[in-house]
């Protein structure tokens, strides 16, 4: 049977185990054996789950007879807000065109580099370096879309030199800067239409690897979806070598665990890729809610953005967005239809038993 969405106490416990700083201010947890209550991010040794209680705020814990932890000071809301303000300041500095080092950032917000790095990742779900790279890539895409010369766009985006761009930006653009500026012209996408256990399927491959796995009911609809995803690319039928890789893909998606060793061309924003990595960590036979998935990446308030990232997935089954359900366990919001989502989850649940 498909697992039901976890209760709120279980979600709180997951955040406490992860020392999730983004949960600070949303609830506190208390330990019966010590009589102390703490923030979710407190670095103190974790108690056994059976000895832990959760409260919506510090006042409720105080009313229940617990005393505040001297280490994390959960009753000091202003201290928590000051920490969040420092992270917000660090984000703004990282978003500037001029690159900044972790040491400079730490000095600017009056924190140690180690503490800043840990708190930044816990609050945003990304490292300071990852945040800076994401904004750098965003500026590059915007500059290229406006038609700026490639070299000027590279430096305007904040890359210190061309070699830094060629090492990193291509992972985000998914193609060369020249091709990106032309809307994907001259990018070749091979494709094949084939059968799989639940109907028809289109498998597409770019020069970098498998870039789309699209289940569907009709070939015409699948081809239309391919053209929507890659409107300016050259769409070429499969050759013999690609047909062999397609058979590997079909063999993988026809099995419960969907283990695929072929290279993948995963194109998306830094946030989308973060969500997709979290999706791949969901064990086969289990489900999570959109709220849990948002909490997993350290952004519990970004539920809508997480759902949008799931919907942007182009690699069906390989990136298992079908394993995300509503908080009450109901199925909804699957790009390729709720009926197909139910089929996939039923198959995984049956073989789990």
Swiss-Prot record:
Binding annotation for DNA: 34, 43, 67
DNA-binding region in chain numbering: 103-124, 150-173
Note on cofactor: Binds 1 zinc ion per subunit.
Amino-acid positions noted as binding Zn(2+) in the UniProt annotation, renumbered to this chain: 38, 42, 69, 72
GO BP annotations, alphabetical order: DNA repair; methylation
Cofactor(s) listed: Zn(2+)
Enzyme type, top EC level: transferase
Cross-referenced InterPro entries: Ada-like_dom_sf, Ada_DNA_repair_Zn-bd, Bifunct_regulatory_prot_Ada, Homeodomain-like_sf, HTH_AraC, HTH_AraC-typ_CS, MethylDNA_cys_MeTrfase_AS, MethylDNA_cys_MeTrfase_DNA-bd
Pfam family, one: Methyltransf_1N
Site (Cleavage): 128-129, 178-179
Role noted for this protein: Involved in the cellular defense against the biological effects of O6-methylguanine (O6-MeG) and O4-methylthymine (O4-MeT) in DNA. Repairs the methylated nucleobase in DNA by stoichiometrically transferring the methyl group to a cysteine residue in the enzyme. This is a suicide reaction: the enzyme is irreversibly inactivated. The methylated ADA protein acts as a positive regulator of its own synthesis, as well as that of other proteins. The transcription-activating function of the ADA protein resides in its N-terminus. It activates the transcription of alkA, alkB and aidB.
Similarity annotation: In the C-terminal section; belongs to the MGMT family.
Descriptive protein name: Regulatory protein ada
Protein species of origin: Salmonella typhimurium (strain LT2 / SGSC1412 / ATCC 700720)
Lineage: Bacteria, Pseudomonadati, Pseudomonadota, Gammaproteobacteria, Enterobacterales
């Amino acid at each position: 049977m498909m697992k039901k969405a976890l209760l709120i106490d279980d979600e709180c416990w997951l955040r406490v185990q992860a020392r999730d700083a983004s949960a600070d201010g949303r609830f506190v947890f208390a330990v019966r054996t010590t009589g102390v209550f703490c923030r979710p991010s407190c670095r103190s040794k974790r108690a056994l789950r059976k000895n832990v209680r959760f409260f919506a705020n510090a006042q409720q814990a105080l009313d229940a007879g617990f005393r505040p932890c001297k280490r994390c000071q959960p009753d000091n809301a202003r201290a928590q807000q000051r920490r969040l303000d420092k992270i917000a300041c660090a984000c703004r500095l990282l978003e500037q065109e001029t690159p900044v080092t972790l040491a400079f950032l730490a000095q600017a917000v009056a924190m140690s580099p180690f503490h800043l790095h840990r708190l930044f990742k816990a609050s945003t779900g990304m490292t300071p370096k990852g945040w800076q790279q994401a904004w750098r890539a965003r500026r590059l895409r915007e500059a290229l879309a406006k038609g700026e010369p490639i070299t000027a766009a590279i430096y305007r985006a904040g890359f210190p030199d061309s070699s830094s761009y060629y090492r990193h930006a291509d992972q985000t653009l998914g193609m060369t800067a020249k091709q990106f500026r032309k809307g994907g012209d001259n990018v070749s996408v091979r494709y094949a239409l084939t059968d799989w256990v639940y109907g028809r399927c289109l498998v597409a491959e770019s020069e970098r690897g498998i870039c789309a796995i699209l289940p569907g009911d009709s070939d015409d609809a699948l081809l239309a979806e391919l053209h929507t995803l890659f409107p300016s690319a050259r769409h070429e039928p499969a050759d013999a070598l690609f047909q062999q890789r397609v058979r590997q893909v079909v063999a993988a998606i026809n099995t419960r665990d969907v283990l695929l060793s072929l290279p993948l061309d995963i194109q998306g924003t830094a946030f989308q890729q973060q969500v997709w990595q979290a999706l791949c960590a969901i064990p086969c036979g289990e489900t999570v809610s959109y709220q849990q998935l948002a909490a997993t990446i350290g952004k519990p308030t970004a539920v809508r953005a997480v759902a949008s990232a799931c919907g942007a997935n182009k690699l069906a089954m390989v990136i298992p967005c079908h394993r995300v359900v509503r908080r009450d366990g109901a199925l909804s919001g699957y790009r390729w239809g709720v009926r197909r989502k139910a089929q996939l989850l039923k198959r995984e649940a049956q073989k789990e038993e």
